[in-house]
Design a protein with these regions (language model features):
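Active-site donor-nucleotide binding/catalytic segment of nucleotide-sugar enzymes
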Residues: 1
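Glycine-rich phosphate-binding loops that contact phosphosugars or nucleotide phosphates
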Residues: 4-143
Length: 145
């Protein structure tokens, strides 16, 4: 939702394209569940705003996928619901959360919690964490090549 949705789109682009300009590699499959405005608005209208991420997740999620949930409050109901769906499919979940981690904390396999009340600081840390983790992923890929 909001800035976290923008962060999700930003980070998924890093997986599909690349993080560092000096590295050429195959694209890594990634999608932001917040990127398709037609699906989001249709789902919000026809079902409920709390289900906007569930419908695409249910259609796209496969065994061995990883779901990264990004929310500054940790309490976004639409994120909580998709995390519950991921758990029922035995999909690994990583939470980029803020504050105390909120309701999402108990549905994530790995919690990266920024203990702040400042939305801006939380979002800045989420992007840093996303870049740092992905840099490690790229390094692992390069070692295997």
């Amino acid at each position: 939702n909001g800035g976290s949705a923008a962060d999700a789109q930003h980070l998924s682009a890093e997986y599909l394209v690349r993080l560092r300009p000096n590295i050429n590699r195959k694209p890594i499959p990634a999608i932001s569940l917040a990127q398709d405005t037609s699906t989001l608005t249709a789902c919000g209208n026809d079902y409920d705003f709390s289900d906007i991420f569930r419908r695409p997740f249910q259609a796209l999620a496969k065994k061995n996928d990883v779901l990264i949930a990004i929310t500054t409050s940790g309490n976004s109901l639409n994120v909580v619901k998709v995390l519950k769906d991921a758990r029922s499919k035995k999909i690994t979940t990583i939470g980029f959360l803020g504050g105390s981690g909120g309701k999402c904390k108990k549905f994530c396999d790995i919690n990266l919690i920024v203990p702040s009340k400042s939305t801006a600081r939380i979002q800045e840390c989420h992007i840093f964490l996303g870049h740092f983790i992905f840099e490690q992923v790229e390094n692992l890929i390069l070692k295997k090549q």
